[in-house]
Structure formats: structure tokens, C-alpha cells
Amino acid sequence: FTRSSLSSNKFYYGDSDYGDYDLDELSFVADKSFSGSVELSFTAYGGTGTRTNQNVTGTLVIATGTSAGVSRYVGNIRYNTTPSTALQINANDIARLFRKYTSGEALQYLTLTSVPATGSLYYNYYNTSKYGSAQMPLTASTAGNVVFSYSPASASEYDLSELTYIPSGSNYCTSLGFTGYSSNGTTVSATILISVTASPVSEVYSVTTKGTSVNFPANSVYSAVASATGFGLSSIQLLELPASKAGVLYSGSYAADVTTAYSYGDGTGSMSQLRFIPNSGFTGSVSIPYVALNSSGTAIGSGVVSIGVVDSVKKFTDISTSTWCYKYVTELASANVISGYSNGTFQEKNTITYGAALKLIMLAAGYSEQAPTVKGSTFSGYLAKAKADGLVSGNPKLNGPITRLQIAQIAAKALKLSTTGLPSKKPFTDTNDVYVQALNAAGIIEGYFSNGTSTYKPNNTLTRGQVSAIVWRMKNSVQ
């Protein structure tokens, strides 16, 4: 119906004849971009007994966008920090998002379309960059005039990796908008959501077997937010839904969405009505990011619910749900990428050997199991295959430790990551290794950041738990 044609039709409540319009079959569908309210004036007719010709007029108001039960937060890229911790915007996060949304095109530069409403955004906050200018606040009136290069070619260009956010206060979410450009003019506009809470909002993780639905962990989400902010949430808004290849998140009998504010409690439209149903045959990791809202609908923080869908849950006696690497170890063990000791333990704090790390990296990259080529040397087959494929050179000691540099070099080669097209500015001050840079650009490894300086510590060794995190990211990057 159009607005003009509504007045020429009658809509019946209750019994009606064939061909009449039922009142309860009227639906209003708002345009996707519409935010506001629609008013429909009506006259209702009826009565009882001898008073059957009564009528009353009224107005029906349908509100969208700012109405109760609806939320409009957006976060294509999401960060969490605390009131006293400066947040460095990761240029590689933006570059990966750009590639994802353009099916592989490279980010060349971006401009800011908005700045955070709370807190302050700076360029070159620590005054350590040789690109662009000295420390410069970026305000609503100035930010849009600066072009930030992903790979600056001269000192006059502004380096995208030098954007720093300084919080102001606690328990809020704010955002930063941008438009990225490729060399051929392709554009992507997106939003960075920044959550500032008294302490980080803990990830809520659960694991399920293949084909088994999972109820949304409403109570755990409530506890995680309350612990981080000191306040109880009233509702949440989902920021992203599971990929279609993974499964469907339902609210009752209908697919969930990213605009509804799902209340904490029971009943229709509540968090307790959310459940994830994985697709038949799917195994892997699913992340469901959200913002936590107070009773006024204002965000007080952001978090994530993660679900591991596995063939079977394999457990180790020394790895519990509170162990920091529980997610990585559980999913990798189920995928037969990682294993423990004969006594049923995993020993996540033990230093990992070169041979054990080599095996994990190759399996995560898609290599098959390699039988020993030397009697009594468990990992000799992996070393032989790695040498043949150019992943390793020389004769490393398989029972000795492996360094962070060696891990990065083997992993980047195993994943066949490109070492061309990387930013001109190196991400770390203590290594110029291109494989380290490629793996960092892929989001698989990170460094140590302090007062404007990032280091990688290439000669440090790693524990079994630390390598499980790297291998998990590798495996998920190739799914």
C-alpha cells in the first residue's frame, strides 16, 4: 500500500469475509537506511450491543533507529583499551579489511571521515616518526585534510601506522571513520570501534562438537562486562554475524541481526533466545563481537563471544577453560595439529623444540603428516620436506629451541606469503626481516610496543602455548 491508498481500504479485526483485509496482516518494512518515525492516523469502528456504530480516532507511531530495542553501533575493526593506555591504530588491520572488501586489492592510502567523539586522536603522538609532521592532534576540522599512506614514499607523506588514540574517561565506546583507496581508485569506507573499559572485557569462549547448536552464553557475557566495567549491562548489540559458511545465529525462530538490542533476561528479543547452529560438516572458529549497552542504550564496552566447532573435544589434564591458550590448544588438538604428552598433559609453559614447532607450522599450512626419514628422529621427515620445499636451510637441531625469527621465516614461507608490496616502514626496530614483516602484515604475529617503539625480539625462544597461538592464527588464515 501507498500512504494515499490506505484510506480507501478497510481492515478487519477478528472475523472477516474472503476478500477483506485482515488488520493483523499489515506490516511496515522500513528502508534499510531509514532512521526516524512514521505516523499513521486511523479511525477504528465497532461497539457492542446497541452501540455498534461507535468510532474512535488515533495515531500509530512506528519508530526506527533510535527506538527502544534498536541500536546502531558499527565496528568493522575493533579495539579495546583501558583509560590509561594509549591505543596505536594498526595499519595492517585496515589493509587486511581493504583486501577483504575488494577481493584482494591493495590499500594505498586513506582519509579520515570522522574522529572519536570522546578522547583524542593524534598523528605521531610519540614524536618518533620521520614521516609527515611532528605530534599533531587530529580534530573534526583538520583530520579530513590529511592523506595517510600505507607505505609512505617520502618524508613529506603521512604514515598510516602513526595514528594514536588517547582515552578520556572509562566505560564507553567511540568510533573513527575512514575511506581507503587503492591505486586504481577503488574505495572502501568503514568504521573503527574503540572500547575503553576499566579493565579489558574478557573473551567468552565455548566449544561444541560438529553439528551441535550452542546457546548464547548470556550469563558469561554479563559477568565479563560487569568485571571489566563495574556495571551490569542491560542489553547487547551484535556487531557482526557468523560467516554463512559457518552457520546461522538465531534469535528464537528467526535469524539474528546487527541492529537489535538483545536484552539481558528471558523472553522474546533477549540474549537467552540467541543460539548458534553450525552448518553440517563445518569445523572451525566462530567469533561474534558485540557492544554492551546500559539501560539508556549507550555502549559501556565491547567484547566478543567465540565458539569452537570441533569433531570431538580433546582434553589435557593441565589445560582448563581459564588457561590463556585454552582456545588454541583445544581447537588444534581436535584438528590433529597439536598433541600432548603420554601422561595426558600439554605443558604449555615448556619451551618448544625446533622439530615440534616445524611440525605444527607445516600441518597448519596444509602439509600432510611426514613419516620419519631417520630412525629414532620423530621430526626428521618434516625437516626433509621443509628443506625440499625451501622452508628451511642448513641443519638445525631438531631437539633444540626455535627462535621467534625462525618461526616467522618458516611460517611465512609455508603459507607462501608475498614479501612484495609491504609497507616501506618496517614494523619493528630490531629486525628488517621480510618474512617477519609479511607474517605481521597477515596478522599472525605481533611485537612488543612501548612509548612509540615496536620490537619483535627475534632471538627469543617460545613456549608451547605461545606457538599454539601462532599456529591457530595460521590455520584460520588458510581456511
Predicted regions and their residues:
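Ampipathic, surface-exposed secondary-structure segments
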Residues: L40-T52, G177-N184, I288-L293, N399-T429, ...
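Extracellular glycosylation-rich, acidic/polar low-complexity regions of adhesion-
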Residues: F1-D311
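Feature responds to low-complexity, polar/acidic, surface-exposed segments characteristic
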Residues: V310-Y326, S334, S339-L405, A411-Q437, ...
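Ca2+-coordinating acidic residues in Ca2+-binding motifs
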Residues: D93, T111, S220, Q237, ...
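Active-site micro-motifs of SAM-dependent methyltransferase domains
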Residues: G36, S223, G284, S339, ...
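Short flexible/disordered coil segments
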Residues: C173-G177, A190, V286, G303-V305, ...
